[in-house]
Amino acid sequence: MMFFSERGTPVVAPISGHVVTIGDVDEPIFSGRVIGDGVAIVPSDGKVVAPISGVVSFIGEQKHTYGIVGYDGIEVLIHLGIGTVRLEGEGFTPAVQVGAKVEVGAPICTMDLELMRAKQFDLTCPVVITSAAMDKVKRLTLLTGPALAGQTVCMRYVPVKA
């Protein structure tokens, strides 16, 4: 399902928790918007769902990053935790494969928050429109506060007209 309106296309929270600005992330590659622009979520639950409808474009080798390209060509990146690449996949259980078509709210992964807390990882999950896709975005609106996975809109974008 695709949503279009004057206010823009919604991107829902892929994980329940509290949405903060990307500038609040304690990792310069995200807070500096090097990879893209968006928000971050401090998770309260480990169930991760698709924030947009589209096709899974990649899954990081360590299972901590997921990309979904929407049917309008805009790519959203979900990065599960900060420094979690060092877990080498431990604590992440993918529910999709690259090339899978997903709808908003479809399960894409489960992350073991207790394991990550025990190993003292920062659980903050950046959710960004990738730098390459930002060239196709005319306007991006970011929304912060409490969020429910698959339900709460955390961003809206207006694509550049072709």
Residue ranges and their predicted role:
Residues 1-162:
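Contiguous, well-folded functional domains in the mature portion of proteins
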